[in-house]
């Protein structure tokens, strides 16, 4: 499948600092955030005009699920648009607090762990053909996902009883299973719950919940692009060396704690391989595969960055990728800070900096400041992100959903939507079922809109 439907779901961390005597719990802060949403959507679980879903998840975490995208730059742009949507809610909520005499600054973090050790996720969704053997996909994909922290981890300072240590991944410490149907209780790497949000006879949806939330656009593109390419190669019958892991959960932690990528990881049957060895195998197959695949500039950019990052890890010289990979950008920032102020990695100020890197408020968040200074590369533009806040992807089913929502809201009509249904809540209860996520034009939807 060379054209693939993809999406990213991001849960955001919430905290608030108060200036007066009045204090609010995280639950109350989250409700303030969603008050504007509830006022027009009558719910804290809504679909937006850009086709995305916005809702309050368990544990007061706002969650933004992008609309269906069929290209990498489109997905990166819509992922960033989610940050803007949440930032707008943040500004509105702070104003509401002020109007009620509650002085406070709300913070939304696009990260994966809070100071209490709770974890929340960034989930990737990939449409795959039903005909394939799912166990083969998960067998080949699992070693890739366990070791891809080397190329797309967000980086984290982990405080251990002995010392503070810099790790590749925020999520690695919180994953407890390889493949499972649960998402919260056991936190697997691949979630097998079969909800295709499409024609179930043709497709299923691969739900990957092991990834870090990335601030860097180029890292997001590499994370999703490399996984999508590996899926495409599996579907095309490309043969990979067997890197079945003896214990994926132990391996994911070992890989996260080794910035050199050289630490041996135990494979099934007693063999060993390093994270770098494993990533090199997938990368080599990708380079070969591109020779036979029809040209695609975005995929070529992904493979180029993949190779440069593996070279950087191998040589431990990160100069050629230090604006493109989250954990590399973050580590360089910490090192400069430590050198300037002569401080240890365990200093609380470094932990504050770690958190501030993921603050999504422009002008305050550290990543935003790095980006403005040219220290973090761009894939998209501010104008494209602003457009994506209100406009759905034009090449997928999201276009139908977005146009239906816009028309219904402007006509003042009551409606219900989900990923596959568009329904007018009138006497006729007219409903259109959109089972094909690739389809952006549908006469039935046009008629439904025209009838408003």
Curated annotation (Swiss-Prot):
Catalysed conversion reaction: ATP + [prokaryotic ubiquitin-like protein]-L-glutamate + [protein]-L-lysine = ADP + phosphate + N(6)-([prokaryotic ubiquitin-like protein]-gamma-L-glutamyl)-[protein]-L-lysine
Keywords noted in UniProt: ATP-binding, Ligase, Magnesium, Metal-binding, Nucleotide-binding, Ubl conjugation pathway
Pathway: Protein degradation; proteasomal Pup-dependent pathway; Protein modification; protein pupylation
Catalytic residues, chain numbering: 57 (proton acceptor)
Lipid biosynthesis listed as a keyword: no
Protein residues bound to Mg(2+): 9, 55, 63
Record's keyword annotation contains Ligase: yes
Note: The reaction mechanism probably proceeds via the activation of Pup by phosphorylation of its C-terminal glutamate, which is then subject to nucleophilic attack by the substrate lysine, resulting in an isopeptide bond and the release of phosphate as a good leaving group.
Protein name: Pup--protein ligase
């Amino acid at each position: 499948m060379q054209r693939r439907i993809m999406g990213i779901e991001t849960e955001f961390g919430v905290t608030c600092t108060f200036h007066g005597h009045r204090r609010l719990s995280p639950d109350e802060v989250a409700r303030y955030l969603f008050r504007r949403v509830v006022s027009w959507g009558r719910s804290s679980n809504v679909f937006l005009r850009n086709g995305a879903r916005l809702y309050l998840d368990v544990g007061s975490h706002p969650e933004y699920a992008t609309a269906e995208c069929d290209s990498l730059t489109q997905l990166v742009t819509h992922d960033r648009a989610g940050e803007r949507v949440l930032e707008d809610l943040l500004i509105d909520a702070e104003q509401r607090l002020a109007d009620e005499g509650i002085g406070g600054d709300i913070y939304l973090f696009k990260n994966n762990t809070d100071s209490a050790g709770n974890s929340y996720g960034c989930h990737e969704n990939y449409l795959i053909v039903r005909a394939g053997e799912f166990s083969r996909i998960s067998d080949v994909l699992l070693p890739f996902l366990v070791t891809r922290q080397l190329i797309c981890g967000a980086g984290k300072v982990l405080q251990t009883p002995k010392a503070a240590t810099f790790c590749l991944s925020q999520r690695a410490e919180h994953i407890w299973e390889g493949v499972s149907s649960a998402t919260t209780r056991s936190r697997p790497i691949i979630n097998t719950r079969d909800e295709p949000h499409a024609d179930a006879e043709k497709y299923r949806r691969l739900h990957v919940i092991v990834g870090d939330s990335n601030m860097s656009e180029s890292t997001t593109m590499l994370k999703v692009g490399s996984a999508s390419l590996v899926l495409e190669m599996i579907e095309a019958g490309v043969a990979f060396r067997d890197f079945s892991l003896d214990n994926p959960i132990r391996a994911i932690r070992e890989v996260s704690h080794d910035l050199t990528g050289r630490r041996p990881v135990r494979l099934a049957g007693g063999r060993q391989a390093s994270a770098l060895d494993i990533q090199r195998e997938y990368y080599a197959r990708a380079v070969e595969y591109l020779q036979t695949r029809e040209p695609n500039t975005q995929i070529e950019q992904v493979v180029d960055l993949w190779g440069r990052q593996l070279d950087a890890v191998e040589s431990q010289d990160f100069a050629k990728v230090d604006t493109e990979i989250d954990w590399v950008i973050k580590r360089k920032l910490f090192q400069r800070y430590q050198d300037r102020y002569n401080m240890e990695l365990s200093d609380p100020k470094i932990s504050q900096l770690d958190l501030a890197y993921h603050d999504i408020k422009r002008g305050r968040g550290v990543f935003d400041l790095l980006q403005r200074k040219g220290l973090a590369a761009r894939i998209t533009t501010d104008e494209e992100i602003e457009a994506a806040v209100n406009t759905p992807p034009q090449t997928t089913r999201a276009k139908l959903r977005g146009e239906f929502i816009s028309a219904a809201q402007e006509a003042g009509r009551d409606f219900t939507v989900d990923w596959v249904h568009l329904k007018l809540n009138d006497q006729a209860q007219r409903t259109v079922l959109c089972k094909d996520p690739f389809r952006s034009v549908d006469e039935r939807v046009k008629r439904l809109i025209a009838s408003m």
